[in-house]
A protein has these predicted regions:
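Juxta-kinase regulatory segment immediately upstream of eukaryotic protein kinase catalytic domains
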Residues: 1-41, 49
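Activation segment/activation loop of eukaryotic-type protein kinase catalytic domains
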Residues: 183-228
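Conserved short submotifs of the Hanks-type protein kinase catalytic core
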Residues: 120-136
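Catalytic-loop of the protein kinase fold
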Residues: 169-189
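Protein kinase glycine-rich loop
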Residues: 49-56, 60
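Glycine-rich ATP phosphate-binding loop
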Residues: 59-82
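Short beta-strand micro-motifs within the conserved protein kinase catalytic domain, predominantly
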Residues: 109-123
Length: 300
């Protein structure tokens, strides 16, 4: 494991140089690694197989491992351009959280990581993790716009995600994910079965007691703005001055929003704003139809 607090210069640690290829540039942003590029990530020297996606400051690749990990020869490499130390701290949070949760079947598996300081300023982080062959849950949902998810499918997805969250909450001290949403769930497929796994742990944090002053409230408010998604925020995140802690209940609230989204492909507060969140005021659409038991689970 080479993700640590002593960052070396970019000149000595960057072991892969992307080559320019006009054909590759049609499908991938400029500066991405080409297939065949070798990258050293900690103790793993991986070979890029294909460019997968882009998000924020990150490029994501499917790579071939030098030796199988848990029987898998492929993995995912997340290459992140980190502009400053605050963003670097978020990446460190993600890496350290994945290490703590390693081995849980509903958490994307951490393999290795590496960070280096760039000569021109900023940092570059490589994060190597398991390849989830089923892709993202949000992409799967988009293939089912006409034929919506069934109640058994929804309960399976929700159960898997809730298990992953419970694993975080049972740590000592507990950790909150703080950014639970369908976009942060990936799908693994083994032997014809699907397993749903939590990813993106850059927002994780321990529970936080209620603010005791206006200054502390402003700090918490800023932290919430930067690390959470509005539609999934709990009332105590919307109004940090109501003197309630931000704890495991905040994640449980977000799980309810996620369950509603699985059912109706929208969040319960999409159109009605923050007052509706504060008052827990929402309605169930008439279509699709679900059992009263499932609706009660949303409300819990």
């Amino acid at each position: 494991m080479s993700y640590n607090h002593s960052y070396q210069s970019h000149a000595s640690t960057h072991r892969a140089i992307p080559q320019y290829n006009p054909m590759a540039a049609m499908t991938a942003p400029a500066g991405t690694f080409l297939p065949g590029t070798k990258v050293q990530v900690g103790s793993h020297r991986v070979v890029v197989e294909k460019y997968l996606s882009e998000g924020g400051f990150a490029h994501v690749y499917v790579v071939r491992l030098p030796h199988p990990v848990d029987g898998n020869e492929t993995a995912v490499l997340k290459r992140v351009a980190v502009p400053d130390k605050a963003a670097l701290a978020n990446m460190r949070t993600e890496v350290e959280t994945m290490k703590k949760l390693k081995g849980h079947r509903h958490i994307v598996k951490y393999i290795d990581s590496h960070a280096s300081q760039l000569r021109g300023g900023g940092y570059e982080v490589f994060l190597l993790m398991e390849f989830c062959s089923g892709g993202g849950l949000i992409d799967f949902m988009n293939t089912r716009l006409q034929n919506r998810l069934t109640e058994p499918e929804i309960l399976k997805i929700f159960s898997d995600v809730a298990e992953g969250v419970a694993c975080m909450h049972y740590l000592k001290p507990p950790l909150l994910h703080r950014d639970l949403k369908v976009e942060n769930v990936l799908i693994s497929r083994y032997g014809g079965a699907s397993y749903y796994k939590l990813c993106d742990f850059g927002s994780t944090a321990p529970p936080r007691p209620a603010a005791t002053s206006a200054a502390e409230g402003r700090l918490i408010e800023d932290d919430v703005q930067r690390h959470t998604t509005l539609q999934y925020r709990s009332p105590e995140m919307i109004d940090v001055y109501r003197k309630q802690p931000i704890d495991e209940k905040s994640d449980i609230w977000a799980l309810g929003v996620l369950l509603y989204k699985l059912c109706y492909y929208t969040t319960p507060f999409e159109e009605v704003g923050q007052m509706a969140i504060l008052n827990a005021s929402y309605k169930f659409p008439s279509y699709p139809q679900f059992s009263d038991r499932l609706k009660m689970l949303v409300g819990r």
